[in-house]
Amino acid sequence: LLHFFANHELLAVELMALALLKFPDAPDSFRKGVLYTLKEEQNHTRWYLKRMEECGVKFGDYHLSPMIWSHISPMESPLDYVSTLSLTFEQANLDYAKHYSEILAQSGDQKSARILSKIYHDEIAHVGHGLKWLRRWKEQSQSDWDAWHKQLHFPVSPIRAKGKVAFNEEGRRLAGLDENFISSLRRHQSSRGRSPDLYYFNPDAEPAA
């Protein structure tokens, strides 16, 4: 579990650095916010790595997924960045971090639980930062939900902004998301963007002699 989250935190650091490189002309206050968030994500990565080491696990002992990088790195604008990273994958972590902090605490691993709890509270601010800039850059006639939904492109869809655990309305409200956005996301169902594997079975086929 910690290895999985460390993988995602490191990818977030790299994507934030990429955003700073890709968008040098973005507003200074936006770039400063990204840099501040990047530093917090570096802390998160360090916390996970240290805790993993204490548990006898090294980074790379398990599979490392490039999925978040492959989905977000093609971003073409700062609005793409906040829509996909801040308001999608970081929003999903409002569910995951809270859920697993509670699970770890119940299981007796208070040290790991505290790490997840601290990260959860940081993620609230990260989602809020993305929401602030979505509201600044979107068409003012659009709702937050419509503007965000329109900005997402396959394979990223709104379902990615929800964890596969309990839906955390409280954390989303603390991040500033409005009730229309929260209820729309709660109801939303779609593919998570993975292409299905198709298999063809030919009952008449025989092994070659």
What feature does the model see in each segment?
Residues 1-209:
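Non-heme di-metal
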